[in-house]
Amino acid sequence: MIATTRDREGATMITFRLRLPCRTILRVFSRNSLVRGTDRLEAVVMLLAVTVSLLTIPFAAAAGTAVHDSRSHVYAHQAQTRHPATATVIDHEGVIDSNTTATSAPPRTKITVPARWVVNGIERSGEVNAKPGTKSGDRVGIWVDSAGQLVDEPAPPARAIADAALAALGLWLSVAAVAGALLALTRAILIRVRNASWQHDIDSLFCTQR
C-alpha cells in the first residue's frame, strides 16, 4: 500500500507498506473443514517458493560483491598495462574499401587491415581494426600491452558494477525461476487432483439419485 504524508516542514513524504496475506495463510492452515488438503499443500509450496527466493537475496548480493572485486582488479590491471599507440596501415592491396562492398549487404563500420607500429623501439606488425576506406599509409589508433603486443581497449572501471549487478540478478532470477516452475508444476498437478475429486463426487451424487 502507498501512503502520502507530510512532515512538520510541509514536505510530502511517500511511504510504501507491504502487507502479507497473514489472514489467508492462517485460514489455510486452520482446522476449517472447508479447507482441502490440496489447498494446504499448495500454500506450503507457495511459502517455500517465496522463502527460498527471499533467502537467495543475500547470497546473490555476496556473489555480486565477489564478482565486483574480481572484475575491478582485472580492469584496474588492464588500465595500468594497456596503452594507446598509433599504427600505420601497410599493403594497400589488402584494404577493403567501403565502395567495393555489395550494395545488398549492410554497411560495415569496421574492417581489418595489416599495419605496423613501434613500441619501445621495436617494430611490430599485425591485423588491426580500421574504418572502411582506410588506405595504405593511413594511421589508426590501437592499444598495446607493456610488451607491445596488440590488445583490446581496456574496459572502463564502471563495467565492474554492471558485471556485479548482472551476476547477482542472474543468480536470483535463476533460483526464483526454478522455485516458480516448481510452484506452477505443483499447481497443475493439484488442479488435476481437484478436478478428479470433483468428478468423483459428481458421479457419486448421480449414482445416489438413481
From Swiss-Prot:
InterPro entries (UniProt xref): MT1774/Rv1733c-like
Keyword Lipid metabolism: no
Domain of life according to the entry: Bacteria
Compartmental location: Cell membrane
Transmembrane segments: 43-63, 165-185
GO cellular component: a single term: plasma membrane
Keywords: Cell membrane, Membrane, Transmembrane, Transmembrane helix
Induction annotation: A member of the dormancy regulon. Induced in response to reduced oxygen tension (hypoxia) and low levels of nitric oxide (NO).
Recorded topology in the membrane: Multi-pass membrane protein
Name assigned to this protein: Probable membrane protein MT1774
Organism placement in taxonomy: Bacteria, Bacillati, Actinomycetota, Actinomycetes, Mycobacteriales
